[in-house]
From Swiss-Prot:
Residues 212-258 form the F-box domain. The keyword Mitochondrion does not apply. Signal peptide: none annotated. The keyword Coiled coil does not apply. This is Cell division control protein 4. Residues 1-146 are annotated as: Disordered. Keywords: Cell cycle, Cell division, Mitosis, Repeat, Sporulation, WD repeat. It comes from Candida albicans (Yeast).
Length: 684
């Protein structure tokens, strides 16, 4: 420690230094140290604080630093009434945010003399508890003992503060030598001496610093990822927290992703179509104009799904009688029309909105057993061994394809699709134009170029044989019995036959049969294809469902459980649903083959069904039932007054269309087309 002669100092300074040195060892034994002896506090003018009495610091305990005032040769420690002591002067320092944040260079001797109000503060569990006596200190296991700590403190206190700013710096530096508990205690002590307005300011600052806006402080991509795990109810609650969160959640991308995740809409093209007319969407389904149209679309779809699942909700119903006692063999519908084929040669087109019969297409000479349309082009296959192409708008038959020698039992339309990438990373699209695939009881499969119908065409293009038909692309031969089912995508055709085999055909290889999949013990009635996973499924009279890799021909799995003919399969995304003559349906995980649910409730063989990943609608004798796919449970009966069979059923997100039979007497029945609309009323 430097001597009194090292620097210019007063006699009182030297005296204070001697006093300090005398007590140094005793304080060090307690882990405390007295400040350096040469602490002469002066002002910027010639008036010195030592004129009233020299003052030095000493640390009395880990939680307390008091001042020692020396007057001539007399030293008085801890005098609470001494107006020159630092503790008293500091307590009278004006405590305002400006004073705290922007220290001035006001001399220490110019501190204001305004008394302050001592305010009791609550003591949270994380804060030190105020002791009963003012001088009681917090004891902690850590100690200031050690030459390094003592020397550091002496170095900090070697420069005397001459301004308010320097004093604040000194206190800040000294507080760094305290333990965490004692630092908390020091803050608590200072807050006790703080005015109410300043406490209010501190409260606001602390509250703001403790708030962490997770959504706003992370990259937008991370925010969207976080939101993707929330359901719509939680999102709506979060949106009410603040305007910033509302703006984030009101982003259309948030709700488009939610539409897909909740399987309300999974096709981007459908979402784009639905959002084409946002004004109409907002007008019909929202009362809040500031909500984005994607959120309103989610609301619309969610309300409609909930109506489906609510047994108390009664959909708008239209019943149409129009086929006598004939069997409806095939059915397809959209928002404008319902198209039915029956076993009496006719094809009927009804209005979906009103149920009115709009057109009857005549020309086939036998029952219609297969139909499918795309756009305005309808294709039908009949027991008369012909395929007909129709313009539905005009009702005109535009083409007749001949070549099959027996009933056309199944057909499919393959649209252009991306099937891979070339060497340059560009999409490979196949086919170039829509293809029509027809399967017949003559064992063969025909591949046709689908004609584009023209409203101005008023004649029928008829081709008597295979060789003079420019639309015929290939004849796929190989099955030895009736072709019962066809599923196609891109360049691949999967066919199931009564010969108990499944065949894989590659149109990029001139329609060559790449694999004959053998494994079933009886007739194959149904097929499904998942092109991207190179997987196909087949259902058979042997009661099994076989899962194949159509690229390698490998039998991957056999799904067992049904007790009779598996006549129907439907694959949507990763959900495979099977329906059998044992009166049950089963829901399978298409990737793993795991059985998710067994749907029991029908009293007879399942004659028709469809699913969309959320709902299954199934029909059997006298029953039309709705099931929840996710839960694997029965939801409701859609019709309760059917007295005969359910011939066909199809549905979209808002309507269910079924062809049903009502028994009039023992020998007579009547077929009806039932249209159930769950989108009415628009708002409820």
């Amino acid at each position: 420690m430097p001597s009194c002669d090292d620097t210019a100092s007063s006699d009182t300074d030297c005296q204070s230094q001697v006093s300090s040195t005398a007590h140094l060892h005793s304080y060090r034994s307690n882990g405390l140290v007295e400040p350096p002896s040469k602490r002469r506090l002066t002002t910027t003018n010639e008036t010195s604080l030592s004129s009233a009495g020299a003052t030095t610091f000493q640390i009395e305990s880990p939680g307390s630093i008091s001042a020692i005032t020396t007057n001539n040769s007399t030293t008085s420690a801890g005098d609470s009434n001494n107006s020159n002591s630092f503790s008293d002067q500091h307590s009278r320092h004006p405590r305002t945010p400006n004073a705290m944040n922007s220290p001035t260079h006001t001399p220490i001797s110019d501190i204001e003399e305004d008394p302050i109000q001592q305010l009791p503060l609550p003591s949270p569990s994380a804060s030190p508890i105020q002791s009963d006596t003012e001088n009681e200190h917090v004891t902690t296991p850590d100690s200031l003992q050690g030459k390094a700590n003592l020397d550091s403190i002496e170095n900090v206190m070697s420069n005397e503060p001459t301004t308010q700013s320097e004093l604040v710096d000194l206190v800040t530096k000294l507080s760094g030598f305290l333990s965490e508990a004692n630092q908390n205690h020091l803050v608590f002590k200072l807050l006790q001496k703080t005015t109410r307005p300043t406490l209010s300011t501190f409260n606001n600052l602390i509250n703001n610093s403790l708030k962490r806006d997770i959504l706003s402080n992370v990259p937008f991509e991370v925010t969207m990822k976080i939101l993707s795990y929330l359901d719509y109810k939680t999102l709506l609650s979060v949106a009410q927290v603040c305007k910033k969160w509302f703006d984030i959640i009101n982003n259309p991308d948030t709700w488009i992703k939610l539409l897909k995740r909740d399987k309300l809409i999974t096709d981007d093209a459908v979402i784009k179509y639905e959002l084409q007319y946002p004004d109409q969407l907002l007008r019909e389904w929202s009362t809040l104009p500031e909500i984005n149209s994607a959120q309103v679309l989610y609301k619309k779809r969610k309300i409609i799904v909930n109506r489906w699942m609510d047994p108390k909700f009664k959909p708008h119903r239209i019943s149409v009688s129009g086929h006598g006692n004939k069997v409806v063999t095939c059915l397809q519908h959209d928002d404008e029309k319902v198209v039915t084929g029956v076993d009496d040669k006719c094809i009927s087109i009804y209005s979906t909105q009103t149920g009115q019969l709009m057109k009857v297409l005549e020309g086939h000479e036998g029952g219609v057993w297969a139909l499918k349309y795309t756009g305005n082009t309808l294709v039908t296959g009949s027991t008369d061994r012909t395929v007909r192409v129709w313009n539905m708008k005009t009702g005109q038959c535009t083409h007749i394809f001949r070549g099959h020698t027996s009933t056309i039992r199944c057909l499919d339309i393959i649209h252009p699709a991306v099937i891979g990438k070339n060497q340059d990373g560009e999409d490979i699209v196949f086919p170039e134009y829509p293809l029509l695939i027809t399967g017949s009881r003559d064992h063969n499969i025909h591949v046709w170029k689908l004609p584009v119908v023209d409203d101005s065409q008023d004649y029928i293009e008829t081709f008597e044989g295979e060789f003079d038909n420019p639309y015929l692309i290939a004849v796929l031969s190989g099955h030895t019995q009736s072709v019962r089912s066809i599923s196609g995508y891109g360049n691949i055709i999967i066919s199931g036959s009564y010969d108990s085999t499944v065949r894989v055909w590659d149109l990029l290889d001139d329609g060559h049969c790449t694999h004959v999949l053998q494994g079933h013990l009886d007739r194959v009635y149904s097929t499904a294809i998942d092109f991207h996973s190179k997987t196909c499924f087949s259902g058979s009279m042997d009661s099994n469902i076989n899962v194949w890799n159509f690229e390698t021909g490998e039998l991957k799995k056999v799904l067992v459980g049904h007790a009779s003919l598996v006549g129907l399969l439907d694959l949507v995304d990763d959900v495979l649903v099977s329906a059998a003559a044992d009166a049950t349906l089963r829901i399978w995980d298409a990737k793993t083959g795991e059985l998710r649910s067994k749907l029991k409730g029908h009293g007879a063989a399942i004659t028709c069904f469809e699913h969309d990943g959320l709902r299954v609608v199934s029909g059997s004798e006298k029953m039309l039932k709705l099931w929840n796919v996710e839960k694997g449970t029965f939801a409701r009966d859609l019709l309760s007054d059917v007295t005969g069979g359910i011939w066909q059923v199809r549905f979209d997100y808002k309507r269910c269309v079924a062809a049903v039979q009502r028994i009039i007497n023992e020998d007579e029945g009547e077929t009806f087309i039932e249209i159930l609309d769950f989108s009415q009323p628009l708002l409820q």
